[in-house]
From Swiss-Prot:
Function: Component of the mitochondrial ribosome (mitoribosome), a dedicated translation machinery responsible for the synthesis of mitochondrial genome-encoded proteins, including at least some of the essential transmembrane subunits of the mitochondrial respiratory chain. The mitoribosomes are attached to the mitochondrial inner membrane and translation products are cotranslationally integrated into the membrane.
Keyword Mitochondrion: yes
Subunit-structure text: Component of the mitochondrial small ribosomal subunit (mt-SSU). Mature N.crassa 74S mitochondrial ribosomes consist of a small (37S) and a large (54S) subunit. The 37S small subunit contains a 16S ribosomal RNA (16S mt-rRNA) and 32 different proteins. The 54S large subunit contains a 23S rRNA (23S mt-rRNA) and 42 different proteins. uS17m interacts with the F(1)-ATPase inhibitor IF(1) dimer.
Keywords (A to Z) from UniProt: Mitochondrion, Ribonucleoprotein, Ribosomal protein
Name of encoding gene: mrps17
Major localisation: mitochondrion
Cross-referenced InterPro entries: NA-bd_OB-fold, Ribosomal_uS17
Subcellular location(s) of the protein: Mitochondrion
Domain of life: Eukaryota
GO cellular component terms listed in the entry, alphabetical order: mitochondrion; ribonucleoprotein complex; ribosome
GO BP term, example: translation
Name recorded for this polypeptide: Small ribosomal subunit protein uS17m
Similarity-based family: Belongs to the universal ribosomal protein uS17 family.
Amino acid sequence: MASTIAAATKVSRKMFRELHGVVVTSGLIDKTVKVRVGGQKFNKFLQKHFDDPKQYLVHDPNNSLRAGDVVAIMPGFITSKSKRHVVKHIIAPAGTPIEERPPIPSLDELWDAKDAAKAAKKERKVLREKMQAAEEAIELAERMARHAVREIAMREKIISLQKVD
């Protein structure tokens, strides 16, 4: 059952389309570049197509892209509120050659790292919940002990009052 789910997720990961664009800005935000992807929009009134480029913030895991690079990006890799794409590979480098830059990890490596981070987060959450449950149990035991001490003190007081009478 688990292996079929894992296989299905691996297949669904590979179903994303590939977009090609030019790196507009790089180096301003760590592990993030802005990529302009070309496109067209049809104007119904003029019955004509106009250029309508889109700009995306793209996850660059090793800061290996430079402004002017032509890259292939893949949507569907959500890393933050505004980053929804990841670099797949460099098509045409601008400036320094690809060999002199840090390597771009493969998509499988990225997904494995993301899954490992998610598993570690889940493990930390389970440990935190166990810790909170243990602290609550200790607090409850302390409250019960204080209540028992008060109860014993009250009974001793009542007994001492009955002996005086």
